[in-house]
Amino acid sequence: MQRKKKGLSILLAGTVALGALAVLPVGEIQAKAAISQQTKGSSLANTVTAATAKQAATDTTAATTNQAIATQLAAKGIDYNKLNKVQQQDIYVDVIVQMSAAPASENGTLRTDYSSTAEIQQETNKVIAAQASVKAAVEQVTQQTAGESYGYVVNGFSTKVRVVDIPKLKQIAGVKTVTLAKVYYPTDAKANSMANVQAVWSNYKYKGEGTVVSVIDSGIDPTHKDMRLSDDKDVKLTKSDVEKFTDTAKHGRYFNSKVPYGFNYADNNDTITDDTVDEQHGMHVAGIIGANGTGDDPAKSVVGVAPEAQLLAMKVFTNSDTSATTGSATLVSAIEDSAKIGADVLNMSLGSDSGNQTLEDPELAAVQNANESGTAAVISAGNSGTSGSATEGVNKDYYGLQDNEMVGTPGTSRGATTVASAENTDVITQAVTITDGTGLQLGPETIQLSSNDFTGSFDQKKFYVVKDASGNLSKGKVADYTADAKGKIAIVKRGELTFADKQKYAQAAGAAGLIIVNNDGTATPVTSMALTTTFPTFGLSSVTGQKLVDWVAAHPDDSLGVKIALTLVPNQKYTEDKMSDFTSYGPVSNLSFKPDITAPGGNIWSTQNNNGYTNMSGTSMASPFIAGSQALLKQALNNKNNPFYAYYKQLKGTALTDFLKTVEMNTAQPINDINYNNVIVSPRRQGAGLVDVKAAIDALEKNPSTVVAENGYPAVELKDFTSTDKTFKLTFTNRTTHELTYQMDSNTDTNAVYTSATDPNSGVLYDKKIDGAAIKAGSNITVPAGKTAQIEFTLSLPKSFDQQQFVEGFLNFKGSDGSRLNLPYMGFFGDWNDGKIVDSLNGITYSPAGGNFGTVPLLTNKNTGTQYYGGMVTDADGNQTVDDQAIAFSSDKNALYNDISMKYYLLRNISNVQVDILDGQGNKVTTLSSSTNRKKTYYNAHSQQYIYYHAPAWDGTYYDQRDGNIKTADDGSYTYRISGVPEGGDKRQVFDVPFKLDSKAPTVRHVALSAKTENGKTQYYLTAEAKDDLSGLDATKSVKTAINEVTNLDATFTDAGTTADGYTKIETPLSDEQAQALGNGDNSAELYLTDNASNATDQDASVQKPGSTSFDLIVNGGGIPDKISSTTTGYEANTQGGGTYTFSGTYPAAVDGTYTDAQGKKHDLNTTYDAATNSFTASMPVTNADYAAQVDLYADKAHTQLLKHFDTKVRLTAPTFTDLKFNNGSDQTSEATIKVTGTVSADTKTVNVGDTVAALDAQHHFSVDVPVNYGDNTIKVTATDEDGNTTTEQKTITSSYDPDMLKNSVTFDQGVTFGANEFNATSAKFYDPKTGIATITGKVKHPTTTLQVDGKQIPIKDDLTFSFTLDLGTLGQKPFGVVVGDTTQNKTFQEALTFILDAVAPTLSLDSSTDAPVYTNNPNFQITGTATDNAQYLSLSINGSSVASQYVDININSGKPGHMAIDQPVKLLEGKNVLTVAVTDSEDNTTTKNITVYYEPKKTLAAPTVTPSTTEPAKTVTLTANSAATGETVQYSADGGKTYQDVPAAGVTVTANGTFKFKSTDLYGNESPAVDYVVTNIKADDPAQLQAAKQELTNLIASAKTLSASGKYDDATTTALAAATQKAQTALDQTNASVDSLTGANRDLQTAINQLAAKLPADKKTSLLNQLQSVKAALETDLGNQTDSSTGKTFTAALDDLVAQAQAGTQTDDQLQATLAKVLDAVLAKLAEGIKAATPAEVGNAKDAATGKTWYADIADTLTSGQASADASDKLAHLQALQSLKTKVAAAVEAAKTVGKGDGTTGTSDKGGGQGTPAPTPGDIGKDKGDEGSQPSSGGNIPTNPATTTSTSTDDTTDRNGQLTSGKGALPKTGETTERPAFGFLGVIVVSLMGVLGLKRKQREE
């Protein structure tokens, strides 16, 4: 809007003031503003009578004065209205005393058009000096020293004065006015003061009027009381403007003048409010930009940076609980709409860590497009510190990395202003103040209260200091409490115990509350404690806590006042580091400069939903600060009174947005590091410095001159360099009308040359000066008015300065007019390529104790999906390391390890990444993965895990090129290789991990027992000799052993030497139980041993006890147990009320025996004996009773030779229930719990009711309340006795109780879930790819549940099932809003169903034949062709190896087709080669084709044998030739070898003497040497011979003419043939022609025929025919049968004609391609015409939500783009896109028929009720999904899902659903939770909504 025209004097003052604003104190500007505001009352005199004028002015002034006093005192914590009248008059206030004399800006001493800073300061000093006499008089009245003096804009000074004395000051001669100093309450007053925002408001009155800022975030609450404009008359976006936009866009709506437009892009509805319960990120961001609160309490009112700016609510995060991330399609739509509707600035406080800078990224491309439209983009840098800070995400480097960047995408966008975070000086937070009512006051100090319910729990309580045994402050142990704690507030020290335990023990001691004193000895508050919320607790710093302890010790019986409230307190973090420790480091990984600038982002107070407020931290808070500031800058540019308005008006597009960014960076103030001698903070951390909004506006109003690097960027990017002298150029632009000269500052701190350093004690990164380094200008810096000057500078480094270090700093320039320019610079001295891309095994990041195993191989068991760390060994001290010689897996399906993959700790972002498996000779076996880029590893604070690169698994199989089948690789040594190029570098790095494929188990021999006696104790060992010929015996030395069936599953072996034939002698100690089981005689031994590949040998042996000479009876398992129960090994129950007990053992002879039953009767045992092994087995029946039994074993059947006697007790009587009742006998309940009661038999030990152990009373009775869920609940009750016998009873109880009727109230069938559902043509049973219709079925929980999808009420059947259809089309991301409600409750919740699909397979056209074999003698075969798809991503595999892929993060809704040119080499094997080529799109639709190639090495064939028909003189001679081998063809030449042709079957008829050459050829292109055969026996000039020669030449001339007329050959050779034909005809016409002349003419003509070149060579023909086949398939029947009006033929017929022409070869490839292009253009036009004709205007003019354009525009754009394509394959891709569009439009038409809308969405149903207003549901803003695999547990295994594969058949279009994955697993604990809160940096991932923080589509191989 236009600003109101100011009075001339004010305008001039404002203009002149520009020269001094760089040195003008903020106080003077505020003084001017206060005076202006509080003297407006005098204007009333112009509108009232003289009689009333005085009274009106007096009343107004009094009211204004009282309000100003009250406001000022409120800021100091004093309630003016509660003071009595005497106190009100006596209290001191701050005032501004203004002099009668004019200030320097108005007294005529300065030029109104231009004055230098020096001149302004000189005149200002004169004005201030003249104030001396007045100041003296004022000080006499106030008894206070005068404060700050002003002389430029205001002639006056500040002072303190009692209210009663204010009139006295007004009476002093020379005093014009006395004005109350105004109090400002911005977003965070301290944050804005850091950036001088108030000065802009005050001096320029810029508050964002007429500007629009787009908030692309989680949503805005437009009803918040601070979301307002002071005046909505002259807004940029009116309601009418918005309605015009929404009429076109077909989405979004107008809300109010402050938030004129909003739309929920994630859920496709108008619910723009974030329903997250804990915190609303977008609302906080919106408040920082433009809240416009009123009132004096900063905790209850917020004013943003640009409070009068309008805000767009572009909600891109769903209200669904299923996802806290967003995707490319959603973001791009919001960005594009922001630009279309006219946003001046867009803010994105979101991103995914460590991004790249490529326009292949759709978000970065969208940002650039927005810039080009003139919308500035401001984006947060990220909250991850450095990649070297391990789990902390702060300003540290524990690994010594050269590449520590973490700036996120889309913040890496070149044109965006990327913002780092500084700490706020003060913070509004919950704080405690402790007073005794007299002299003690502790605080206010920031605290963390266990629950807000306890704010009053500490007030007026007594305190109790808990002391330990030494009399020191206790850490809260139970034993340290006494009875004195009861009812008091206990005070303990931090440490040893968990916070929860401290609370528990204090509560148990009867304390009323707990205060935990920090233990670090500092004043740092304790604000990150894991407290329970059930007991009043908070913490104090060490300093404050000790003061409290001391006071309580002196006043043990006194109570204290404790006030806990929101309070403005100093930010402790600011005193430790002015920058926020979490702010992400730059630069971009290619050494581009980022971040750009810093703003306050740490501890910012801003708005929340429902008129709420909260404190949040993050670059998410810093970014909106800059967005608001750029709105102010844009307002300044729009000010027609600005002296540079004419220049600003012509700025458009990126020129405008770059200018705003440059001005802010040029005027930013570099921050110094208070912890390291005030050196600079690295530009890689702070960018250009802290924003100074006042300085930026000053520049725009006074002198908008700038300095940039040679490439136009407002920072110097030196990249990497190796010379100690580095030159660079700066461009200075003077936009004033006067010449400017600049001097570079020589401050030894700010302007020194710096490099990075690491504090060895803390790991903190800081900058240090490079001694001897300097930067000098090559010439004086003089810039003519209105011109630019390019100046060369030289950076000089000392020769001793080591390479591989950053070099950085700031260049500051002072202009001749006093203006200043700031420019950061940064580069890398050394080779950026050199830094490793991946950490090595056991490398710098390897820290098992911290849960980080770094780079590590993973071995997977396919049956269970469990993963294990490969080669992991543990030394004697318990340290784990990876032994790279022990990494192995087996191709034996029975082995534990069935495949290998790698989890890489990437140290850098890398591009052109390839993962290969190599054999022992370094030959490539397969390529597992090929991708454009991979992101470095970092710790994601939101998901609490490291984000690794999980590379694909190899299962030991390979593609056999000979037959096209998958085969198992041979055992041997292999290499797992990753290679890639570091971003910003150009050299490929390789990292190899060796491993072995071993399918053979180790061999074991000579199993025996040995014994050693140590300290009087005999230790027995199981010994053996073992050998493994490949992977080696298990490096962990783990074995399993059994002695007489007593097992030891955790045994280990030791090496005891090596045999001569290479066996390792091993010995394993027996456990005590195994030793006890040993007997004299044959002991059964079992040794289970594996190799490193997990192949197992299970060796059984019979061993003798060392030293034994007798053979005693041995019963396995240590003998018959003392008790036989249902849990005893060997017992097996039967159905007759008993069972059988079986035992076994060894004895050198048969064993017999007896047993006694329950009645004491003796019976014979059932025994068997194996003489070969000396083993026996015996069994005895037992009954379900408790009784004593005896077992006797004998050496004879007569039972005379007793071997052993056993006494045992049979204990098989199970416990019993009496009077067992479930729910008092009822099967139904409406309660939350049911009661289970009963009595059990006396021998019962425990009763388990579900998961609860019931308490038994003295009568063995129990009663348990069991919670039940809605629906059927099966309740199990199990009684267990002392012997382990159990009895179980169960009952099903149906519960109608449901505390949350809406929780889990809707479930879907066939795998459909709320959130993202991603599928392709064949992977979803609910979807029909032919129609594009999805049929969604499911069930609701209650009959009262209601379900609304996309605005339509879904009918619920009587059986609670439902079914509805959605038209999804064939491609895109389609969100549908879902509202679930219940008719019995007045509430709903909102969810979303999002479908991400591609139902169209890519096309694949190969240049080589796929129908007939190809033969070659060249081992290097090139596969060429093209692939297209309806979306932009394609990947290519050849022979199962992934060889190429495109940028994976695509906008699937862009409508842009995909295209890939194929040109891949393949090394051929000798003989047959089956080459399988497959292309796959973004949703795993795959098209496959095979090429069969036969290859034989090039060789020289044996020469053919030539035989003449006669050697006698003859008229003709027939020459026949035979090849030396079968399969060869003999060719001849009659023209000396110029041309050859096949020898006819009948031979070559020769009519004239001459020399003929013959050679043999084969299919592979091999040839023999040519042999000459000279014909000399033709009789000359024989009339018959002459006639024959004429006839032969006549025939050949006729043949030549036929060939010339065929049109198959190119012009050059056809012309040569015509000339040869004419020459032959001339020879024929000669009357004196001889046989020789005719033969020569014949030979020349034959040569010309042989040299004819086909218009369409064979390879081109094959390629074209394949291409035509693909086109015909894409057209399908309906489109192919339509007629081209220009030709009258169907398109299929036209293609058939092309096929015929290609087969005939009468046109060149270019001609045929041109014709094909015309056909495809006609097809595109016909298809577009048909779509448009079938689309009613109301639908065609409606908006496609995916593209933001009308359907008609989508059709036209796709048609135009397709017809503009030069390549037929591109046209085919656009045809696919148009076909996909056809499906979408048809769906929109169908929807319009039903509900009257045309945007592809549905509106109000005519049956199911109206469009619901979705109620928000919780989401989790700022959470990155860990998208690259889960982490192994510390125990060494990772549970995962088994990998699957799906093969494809020849030339089939198939779906690939089973790509190998590395699995999912449990996350290892990584130590104590970080003590800083999540900072709201929104993680973004795409389409599976997708993995690790976020924006990115799923990675193909993960």
From Swiss-Prot:
Gene Ontology terms: biological process: proteolysis
Residue span(s) of domain Peptidase S8: 191-697
Gene Ontology molecular-function annotations: serine-type endopeptidase activity
Keywords, alphabetical: Cell wall, Hydrolase, Peptidoglycan-anchor, Plasmid, Protease, Repeat, Secreted, Serine protease, Signal, Zymogen
Pfam families (UniProt xref): fn3_5 (PF06280), Glucodextran_B (PF09136), Gram_pos_anchor (PF00746), PA (PF02225), Peptidase_S8 (PF00082)
Enzyme Commission number(s) from the entry: 3.4.21.96
Start and end residues of each stretch annotated as Disordered: 1796-1874
Catalysed reaction, written as an equation: Endopeptidase activity with very broad specificity, although some subsite preference have been noted, e.g. large hydrophobic residues in the P1 and P4 positions, and Pro in the P2 position. Best known for its action on caseins, although it has been shown to hydrolyze hemoglobin and oxidized insulin B-chain
Composition bias type Polar residues, residue spans: 1830-1843
GO cellular component assignments: extracellular region; membrane
Pentaglycyl murein peptidoglycan amidated threonine carried by residues: T1870
Intervals of motif LPXTG sorting signal: 1867-1871
Protein family: Belongs to the peptidase S8 family.
Protein name per the record: PII-type proteinase
Gene symbol of the encoding locus: prt
